[in-house]
Amino acid sequence: MNINDVKRAVSEIKEKSPQRKFEESVEIAVNLKDVDMSNPKNRINEEILLPNGRGKDVKIAVFGSDELKSKARGVADFVFGAEDISKFAEDKKAFKKIVNQAYFFIAEATLMANIGKSLGQVLGPRGKMPRPIPPGQDPAPLIKNLKNTVKARSRNALTFHVPVGTRSMDADKISENIMTVINRITGKLERGASNIRSIYVKTTMGNAVEIKAGDEK
């Protein structure tokens, strides 16, 4: 499978999918084969920085000291202190609302143990345990990268979906994003591309188009 295979499929979904009244996301569906998903070691759980970004904003939440909070304001979407950990531990319903909105969490390294103990049961199953950041470090570069990062998580299923952009993005840029994701996933599979049955690309409301490897029309 090469970039030209991907470009053909992306061009087809953009041509055949009518314009909607909202910005559609573009995602790929990866179908694996001959992989024992009952073994956690075989599951895909990757965070992938897209070279051309996601095409849309995602929210980032930060837990930190006063210094980190000050640096994160205006860059992160949610900023919390150590005192908020205990508050959220007592009000899990309120915290779940934040978790449903934030795509990634960042936490000062010194707070990680407390967050794991108090909020891990909410964050863990959703794959949203915070990324630790050293005390005093500027969080802005990490936040910028995370806003352009996607998660590829198979859990225990042979089929999983990964966002790769939005419909309004240039087809070449979407294709480059897709190749980045495919290359990462392929590199994590025991037999590489031989463990991939098929890959489809689609917009939110559009029909899926298979990316056919080696199709040189």
Swiss-Prot record:
Source domain of life: Archaea
Keyword hit for Ribonucleoprotein: yes
Pfam families per UniProt: Ribosomal_L1
Cellular component per GO, a single term: large ribosomal subunit
Disulfide bonds: none
PROSITE patterns assigned to the protein according to its UniProt record, in alphabetical order: RIBOSOMAL_L1 (PS01199)
Biological processes, Gene Ontology terms: regulation of translation; translation
Keyword list, A-Z: Repressor, Ribonucleoprotein, Ribosomal protein, RNA-binding, rRNA-binding, Translation regulation, tRNA-binding
Annotated Gene3D superfamilies: 3.30.190.20, 3.40.50.790
Subunit structure: Part of the 50S ribosomal subunit.
Role played: Binds directly to 23S rRNA. Probably involved in E site tRNA release. Protein L1 is also a translational repressor protein, it controls the translation of its operon by binding to its mRNA.
Family membership noted in the UniProt record: Belongs to the universal ribosomal protein uL1 family.
Name of the featured protein: Large ribosomal subunit protein uL1
Annotated source species: Thermoplasma acidophilum (strain ATCC 25905 / DSM 1728 / JCM 9062 / NBRC 15155 / AMRC-C165)
Gene name tied to this protein: rpl1
